[in-house]
């Protein structure tokens, strides 16, 4: 809608890209509704009022305005490292527009502004658990919401592994270095590259 004032009643004529079924003006403020417009920037719309004596007003130039009915598109860029021991993990997603971020599910963050680019946010402190319900949505400056982005499931685990059994046992005798295998059992699955050993006589 658009409001303008006229000092006489008359017939409204529209110019440029805008039109309306509201074609009668009163002496005073008039609020009209433009016919449907496509998403775009409009700077050429004009309004003229012609009175009963066929005298035309000046052509009123409507201030430039933007019609935007399309929400941003958001997508995951870098998932949360899983499993991980960071209770405030970072997450990167992309947005096609600037806007305000809202969070859903178990996750939240103090990062609430999105750029039209990649965005890295830090989730607020999370407990040890697996999270598969976290969502992110970006709403642009026109109030259009993005698609709902489901964050890939991740696990936070802060308890270090323990050794549950060792062969040979401590101080065990009659062990052959050449034929006996040394085995260690841990309380959980291990990253082999992170396991180190020390040997001493």
PLM feature spans:
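Short, exposed coil/turn segments at beta-strand boundaries within extracellular/luminal domains
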Residues: 53-59, 142-148
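Surface-exposed, short loops/turns at beta-strand junctions within beta-sandwich domains
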Residues: 33-43, 122-132
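Short, conserved beta-strand segments of beta-strand-rich sandwich/propeller modules, principally
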Residues: 43-46, 90, 132-135
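Short, solvent-exposed loop/linker segments at the N-terminal edge
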Residues: 81-87, 172-178
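Conserved structural position at the C-terminal beta-strand
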Residues: 49-51, 138-140
């Amino acid at each position: 809608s658009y409001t303008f004032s006229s000092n006489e009643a008359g017939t409204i004529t529209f110019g440029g890209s805008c039109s309306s079924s509201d074609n009668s003006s009163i002496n005073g403020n008039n609020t009209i509704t433009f016919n449907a417009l496509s998403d775009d920037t409009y700077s050429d719309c004009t309004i003229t009022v012609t009175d009963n004596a066929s005298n035309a007003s000046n052509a009123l130039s409507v201030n430039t305005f933007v019609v935007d009915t399309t929400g941003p598109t958001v997508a995951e860029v870098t998932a949360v490292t899983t499993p991980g021991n960071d209770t405030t993990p970072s997450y990167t997603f992309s947005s096609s527009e600037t806007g305000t971020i809202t969070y859903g599910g178990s996750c939240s963050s103090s990062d609430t502004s999105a750029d039209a680019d990649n965005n890295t946010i830090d989730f607020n402190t999370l407990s040890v658990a697996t999270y598969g319900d976290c969502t992110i949505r970006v709403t642009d400056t026109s109030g259009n919401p993005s698609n709902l982005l489901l964050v890939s499931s991740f696990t936070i685990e802060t308890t270090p592994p323990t050794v549950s059994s060792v062969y040979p046992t401590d101080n065990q005798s009659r062990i052959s270095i050449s034929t006996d295998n040394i085995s260690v059992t841990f309380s959980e699955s291990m990253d082999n590259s992170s396991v180190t050993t020390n040997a001493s006589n």
